[in-house]
């Protein structure tokens, strides 16, 4: 090999390394982790049926999960069942822990949680599973009916990267159908931030399902409670057909 060839080889290696470093600088840590298939830490706000079920599926897939709710001491038994990748504590600690957050509370609590934690959640990917129920949640259910649930959640969480997900089926179905043989159970998702949607899609797959990107947060009304995409225990191809999605 000539000296000139050696210099060219070293130059190409340096350029490749520099490009990788630049790419790392431009991508959020969580996005890089998801792109490489690595497991990111996840926090939950709420640890009821959906929170504990989806959180447990992520633990089984190798994610570290920090569960939180109003009474974290009551989660000790659940943490013991899930094993060393799971822990529990206050909401603020779960938010600090997670590169992504699962939001799973009664929808009537959304305004207060947004008021209390939006600043800490700013810039994070938040998977919103919550459904508005008029008899339980009051006036905010009317707001959801008028404006759509995705847009309404985003209103109360300014600066947060909201993605709607895991809201269409009950926890027992998620528990039973996770990681079934192909074709997997479809989980519709929607969000305004493309990178947040991509990360959420990866987390849906890690839980054992097939994500179906429906569109922006305004399009989440297509699978909110009572809409055509709600309650659909179907494959991705079937869900796309039901919602007239072209992709």
Label the predicted regions.
Residues 31-35:
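Boundary at the C-terminal end of the N-terminal hydrophobic targeting segment
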């Amino acid at each position: 090999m000539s000296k000139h060839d050696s210099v060219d080889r070293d130059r190409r290696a340096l350029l490749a390394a520099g490009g990788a470093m630049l790419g790392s600088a431009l991508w959020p840590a969580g996005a890089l982790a998801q792109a490489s298939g690595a497991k990111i830490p996840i926090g939950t706000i709420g640890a009821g049926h959906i929170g504990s079920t989806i959180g447990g599926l992520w633990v089984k897939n190798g994610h570290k999960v920090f569960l939180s709710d109003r009474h974290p001491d009551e989660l000790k038994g659940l943490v013991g069942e899930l094993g060393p990748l799971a822990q529990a504590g206050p909401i603020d600690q779960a938010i600090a822990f997670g590169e992504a957050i699962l939001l799973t509370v009664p929808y009537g609590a959304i305004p207060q949680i947004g008021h209390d934690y939006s600043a800490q959640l700013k810039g994070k990917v938040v998977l919103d599973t919550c459904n508005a129920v008029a008899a339980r949640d009051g006036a905010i259910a009317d707001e959801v009916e008028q404006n759509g649930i995705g847009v309404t959640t985003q209103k109360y969480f300014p600066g947060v990267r909201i993605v709607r997900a895991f809201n269409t089926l009950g926890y027992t179905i998620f528990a039973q159908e996770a990681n079934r043989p192909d074709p997997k159970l479809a989980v519709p998702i929607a969000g305004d931030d493309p990178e947040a949607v991509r990360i959420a899609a990866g987390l849906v797959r890690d839980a054992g399902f097939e994500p179906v990107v429906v569109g922006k947060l305004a399009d989440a009304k297509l699978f909110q409670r009572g809409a055509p995409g709600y309650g659909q225990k179907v494959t991705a191809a079937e869900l796309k057909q039901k919602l007239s999605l072209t992709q």
